[in-house]
């Protein structure tokens, strides 16, 4: 798995400090409100520590936590980057249910607690590349989607895995007001091939920076597919359906000439309105500290995922 040098991204010192404290105290999924140790105060339900297996040690240097939680695309809460943190602050994620259905032998439902204790949680530090040509490095906490797929026991007809975001216009103003929500036909829907879903890199995340996901980042559970553009990593999932046929996903329906089904990070295939050859790195600096770097094929995960697309024309199947 590709790693960063210490000069690639602004370090997140606070994350390492907090994780050491949490681990030393032996605290797990129970509620934990940390005292003021140098990071911004947040709602107590966002400070619940998660019990997880650390990512392998290395020179991973992370995007500052306040940028990860304050610079978001989540159109259900508005199209401005700051809107999700502002309008999702009272979003209720407990109780919650995640339904597994479709072409499976073992359909089931997970409640809120089961999202955190059904599968062993682990930390994954991944590059995150938005289709808008900006990037972050984020320490997710979650479990491989493959574990859930194996529990569901898909039938031989299951070729695609379809994900559905919660539809709740009373809580999600972007669903209530189409202008506020970017003109999207909600609920938001995304999908992967069954092979993509089973790849070890594909993660269902329930946390970041050692804590439960905040609402603006897709609480309580979201998809993370690090070799694809960020819009594939659907948030606040309530249903996963196994299907024989490929659906038309949300952005594919809205603008098919701009957003394809596969959405693999590819510096050789530009968006119709901008280049994808490089990306703006979201770091600790302001506008005067903008850093750009070359975009890597499959976002740097080519060795792990290129075989999934053997024989596929990635310029046509973008």
Swiss-Prot record:
Cofactor binding notes: Binds 1 Mo-molybdopterin (Mo-MPT) cofactor per subunit.
Task: Look up the signal peptide feature and give its range.
Answer: 1-40
User: GO CC annotations?
Assistant: periplasmic space
Q: Give the location in the cell.
A: Periplasm
Primary localization class, coarse: periplasm
- Record keywords: Metal-binding, Molybdenum, Oxidoreductase, Periplasm, Signal
Kindly provide the PTM information from the record: Predicted to be exported by the Tat system. The position of the signal peptide cleavage has not been experimentally proven.
What's the catalysed reaction? L-methionyl-[protein] + a quinone + H2O = L-methionyl-(S)-S-oxide-[protein] + a quinol; L-methionyl-[protein] + a quinone + H2O = L-methionyl-(R)-S-oxide-[protein] + a quinol
UniProt xrefs under InterPro entries: MsrP, OxRdtase_Mopterin-bd_dom, OxRdtase_Mopterin-bd_sf
Q: How does it assemble?
A: Heterodimer of a catalytic subunit (MsrP) and a heme-binding subunit (MsrQ).
Purpose: Part of the MsrPQ system that repairs oxidized periplasmic proteins containing methionine sulfoxide residues (Met-O), using respiratory chain electrons. Thus protects these proteins from oxidative-stress damage caused by reactive species of oxygen and chlorine generated by the host defense mechanisms. MsrPQ is essential for the maintenance of envelope integrity under bleach stress, rescuing a wide series of structurally unrelated periplasmic proteins from methionine oxidation.
Protein name per the record: Protein-methionine-sulfoxide reductase catalytic subunit MsrP
Q: Which organism is it from?
A: Actinobacillus pleuropneumoniae serotype 3 (strain JL03)
């Amino acid at each position: 798995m590709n790693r960063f040098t210490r000069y690639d991204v602004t370090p997140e010192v606070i994350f390492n400090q907090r994780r050491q404290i949490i681990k030393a105290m032996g605290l797990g999924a129970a509620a934990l409100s940390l005292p003021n140790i140098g990071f911004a105060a947040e709602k107590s339900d966002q400070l619940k520590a998660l019990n997880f297996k650390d990512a392998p040690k290395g020179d991973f240097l992370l995007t500052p936590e306040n940028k990860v939680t304050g610079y978001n695309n989540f159109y259900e809460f508005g199209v401005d980057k700051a809107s999700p943190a502002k309008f999702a602050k009272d979003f209720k994620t407990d109780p919650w249910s995640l339904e597994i259905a479709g072409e499976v032998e073992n359909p089931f439902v997970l409640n809120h607690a089961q999202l955190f204790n059904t599968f062993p949680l682990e930390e994954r530090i991944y590059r995150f590349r938005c289709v808008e040509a900006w990037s972050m490095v984020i320490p997710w906490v979650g479990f491989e989607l493959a574990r859930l797929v194996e529990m569901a026991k898909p039938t031989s007809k299951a070729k695609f895995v379809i994900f559905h975001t919660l539809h709740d216009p009373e809580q999600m103003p972007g669903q209530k007001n189409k202008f506020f929500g970017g003109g999207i036909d909600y609920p938001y829907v995304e999908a992967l091939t069954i092979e993509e879903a089973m790849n070890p890199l594909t993660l269902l995340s329930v946390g970041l920076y050692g804590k439960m996901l905040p609402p603006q980042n897709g609480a309580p559970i979201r998809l993370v597919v690090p070799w694809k553009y960020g819009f594939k990593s659907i948030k606040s999932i309530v249903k996963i359906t196994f299907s024989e046929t490929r659906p038309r996903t949300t952005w594919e329906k809205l603008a098919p000439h701009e957003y394809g089904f596969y959405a693999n990070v590819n510096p050789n295939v530009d968006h119709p309105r901008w280049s994808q050859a490089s990306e703006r790195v979201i770091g600790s600096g302001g506008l005067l500290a903008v850093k750009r770097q070359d975009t890597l094929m499959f976002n740097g995960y080519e060795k792990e995922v290129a075989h999934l697309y053997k024989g596929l024309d990635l310029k046509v199947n973008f």
